[in-house]
Amino acid sequence: MPSTIRLHRVLRATPEWVYRAFLDPDAMVKWLPPNGFTGKVHHMDAHVGGSYKMSFKNFTMGKSHAFGGEYVELVPHERIRYTDKFEDPNLPGAMKVTIIFKKVSCGTDVSITQEGVPDVIPAEACYLGWQESLILLAKLVEAEILV
């Protein structure tokens, strides 16, 4: 049975910055690929009904996998919902991802739900990948660059 992954983080950044990091192609390749992977955005049309395609490449092995989907809901600085599907036929099914951004006293509370993760991907591996990605997201949006 497909897995559902739920993650929660509080980031020291505004909802505007965190939301933008999920929709900006340059930001996505900086933070979304987990440790050991590089990323490439092939296209990103971030509007409801628009689509995206991205790939991760294992840096040491050179193997890559592509995935993409469609934006279902975009509420600026509050919520993103999209579908996500791997191109590899061995990773079947469409996933549904919901990200909720909530302004809190010290930044942004981010909740992520990823439903329908294919059975062949261990849930713990998915959690690990997301955790690594969220550390990179924090480094991007929490940076205090004065120039």
Question: Language-model segments: which ranges?
Answer:
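Hydrophobic ligand-binding cavity/cleft-lining segments
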Residues: 1-38
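Intrinsic-disorder/low-complexity, polar/charged segments enriched in Ser/Thr/Lys/Arg/Asp/Glu/Gln
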Residues: 2-8, 15, 39, 51, ...
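Short, surface-exposed charged micro-motifs
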Residues: 8, 43, 70, 98-100
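A generic beta-sheet turn/junction motif
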Residues: 11, 75, 103-105
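Hydrophobic pocket/interface hotspot
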Residues: 18, 28, 52, 71, ...
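Glycine-rich portal/gate segments that line the openings of hydrophobic small-molecule binding cavities
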Residues: 40-83
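Beta-strand/loop substructures that line and gate deep hydrophobic ligand-binding cavities in soluble
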Residues: 81-131
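Short, highly charged C-terminal tails/helix-capping segments
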Residues: 140-147
